[in-house]
């Protein structure tokens, strides 16, 4: 179980409250698919993924990125109970989608990068540390069903 201090929770929510879910979600998922192209196999029904430009301009990628960040928002609201919050998604990704759990960590790292570009001045090392702790906690919660 991950424990967040009051300061870490405040650092996370101060950024989260300003996040444009579609923009940041689409950019995060798009970067994942570009930087780690093997992850594209999970999105073969999403249309044209032939280039970075095609991926970043793909409306289905943006929509799914928004969906991913909407789910992450549940984690932001329930930081002290990530395992239970993501139990259903862990089961879905393990049993039905067969997603390599390492991909959750990669996606979390992409999110931290995207947030740092969108909120450069506010994204201090302390804020980054809090976000890194959150995305690792979420990745571990999503990986729980695999163990």
Curated annotation (Swiss-Prot):
Keywords: Heme, Iron, Metal-binding, Oxygen transport, Transport
Tissue specificity of this protein: Red blood cells.
Domain of life per record: Eukaryota
Binding site for heme b: 64, 93
Single GO cellular component term: hemoglobin complex
Ranges where the Globin domain occurs: 3-147
Keyword Glycoprotein: no
A Pfam family it matches: Globin
InterPro entries assigned: Globin, Globin-like_sf, Globin/Proto, Hemoglobin_b, Hemoglobin_oxygen_transport
GO MF terms, alphabetically ordered: heme binding; hemoglobin alpha binding; metal ion binding; oxygen binding; oxygen carrier activity; protein-containing complex binding
GO biological process, one term: negative regulation of transcription by RNA polymerase II
Binding partners and assembly: Heterotetramer of two alpha chains and two beta chains.
Task of the protein: This is an embryonic beta-type chain.
Family according to the record: Belongs to the globin family.
Alphabetized PANTHER family for the sequence: HEMOGLOBIN FAMILY MEMBER (PTHR11442), HEMOGLOBIN SUBUNIT EPSILON (PTHR11442:SF7)
Protein known as: Hemoglobin subunit beta-H1
Gene: Hbb-bh1
């Amino acid at each position: 179980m991950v424990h967040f201090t009051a300061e870490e929770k405040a650092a996370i929510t101060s950024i989260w409250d300003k996040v444009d879910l579609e923009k940041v979600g689409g950019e995060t998922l798009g970067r994942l698919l570009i930087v780690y192209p093997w992850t594209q196999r999970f999105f073969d029904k999403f249309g044209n993924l032939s280039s970075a430009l095609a991926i970043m301009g793909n409306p289905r990628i943006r929509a799914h990125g928004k969906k991913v960040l909407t789910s992450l928002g549940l984690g932001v609201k329930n930081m002290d109970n990530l395992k239970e919050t993501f139990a259903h998604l862990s089961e879905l990704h393990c049993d039905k989608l067969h997603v390599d759990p390492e991909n959750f960590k990669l996606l979390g790292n992409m999110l931290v990068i995207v947030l740092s570009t969108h909120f450069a001045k506010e994204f201090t090392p302390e804020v980054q540390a809090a976000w890194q702790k959150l995305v690792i906690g979420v990745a571990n919660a999503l990986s729980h069903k695999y163990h």
